């Protein structure tokens, strides 16, 4: 017991004090890299508990749930202007093929928002209210990212709205890029006279690889541009590599568990997918915020 207590005390002293005084230039590259990543992990754990990231993720999950339908409506309004709304609908049904009832519900409400906005002045006012819900959600995302970076002052309102509008315009095309890669691959096989079903395994690998790449790119942009602080892109990218891979794995598991939800559809209908959807959003924000903490740690590890 004394030996265990002594080793525990030494480990605590090393992690709390000694590791921060090590001169990395005196170590080999491998050891220096290991110590640096240990410091990054310690900074992330410390800021994670201090900023109460778990509670922040729950709050953002609530805001995201409120803005799902308005966000989908805005995306369809934007893609509809480019003639891509049908392609996006096809993508959603194929991607969430075990939750078609809840997709029907979300798309139905989203279409109602669009139709109402086009029919009358009051409908336009309602649509603007829904757009404000999205803006409100994104402003809360910025607030949480600023908390991670210990930034007290937010951008002025014009810059915040400009960034949010840019994100709303770009986000549908990020989704379409992901969809387009799989679509082009399938049509290339058909053009070459090859059986698409015979290459289904390769298609799955390409689809998930593309999903991971899009996730890494999206998260790196979030970590770089959302905080009201200078963030080196290399640090944002390294953090995004972790969160993008973790998010892709979580997404795969989410789609696999929808098979279980399908069995409950006969009893609960579309509501069977709601608890799993809420858990998915919560874990997703948890992963994204850990990535934000990592980007902060990478940038300040040598301070």
Task: Name these PLM-found stretches.
Residues 2-303:
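Membrane-embedded alpha-helices and immediately adjacent juxtamembrane helical segments
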């Amino acid at each position: 017991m004394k030996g265990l207590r002594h080793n525990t005390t030494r480990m605590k002293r090393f992690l709390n004090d000694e590791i921060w005084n090590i001169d990395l230039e005196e170590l080999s590259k491998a050891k220096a890299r290991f110590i640096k990543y240990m410091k990054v992990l310690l900074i992330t754990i410390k800021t994670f508990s201090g900023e109460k990231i778990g509670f922040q993720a729950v709050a953002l999950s609530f805001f995201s749930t409120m803005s799902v339908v308005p966000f989908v409506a805005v995306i369809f309004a934007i893609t509809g202007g480019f003639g891509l709304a049908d392609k996006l609908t096809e993508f959603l049904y194929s991607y969430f093929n075990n939750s078609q009832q809840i997709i029907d519900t979300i798309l139905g409400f989203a279409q109602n928002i669009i139709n109402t906005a086009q029919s009358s002045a009051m409908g336009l006012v309602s649509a603007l209210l829904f757009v404000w819900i999205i803006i409100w959600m994104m402003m809360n995302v910025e607030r949480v990212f600023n908390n991670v970076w210990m930034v007290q002052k937010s951008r002025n309102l014009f810059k915040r709205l400009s960034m949010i509008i840019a994100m709303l315009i770009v986000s549908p095309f990020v989704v379409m890029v992901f969809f387009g890669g799989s679509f082009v691959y399938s049509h290339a096989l058909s053009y070459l006279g090859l059986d698409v079903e015979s290459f289904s395994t390769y298609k799955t690998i390409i689809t998930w690889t593309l999903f991971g790449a899009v996730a890494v790119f999206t998260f790196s942009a979030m970590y770089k541009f959302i905080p009201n602080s200078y963030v080196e892109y290399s640090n944002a990218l390294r953090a995004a590599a972790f969160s993008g891979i973790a998010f892709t794995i979580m997404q795969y598991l989410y789609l696999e568990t929808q098979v279980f939800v399908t069995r409950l559809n006969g009893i609960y209908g579309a509501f069977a997918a709601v608890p799993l959807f809420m858990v998915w959003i919560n874990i997703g924000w948890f992963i994204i915020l850990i990535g934000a903490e990592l980007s902060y740690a990478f940038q300040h590890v040598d301070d």
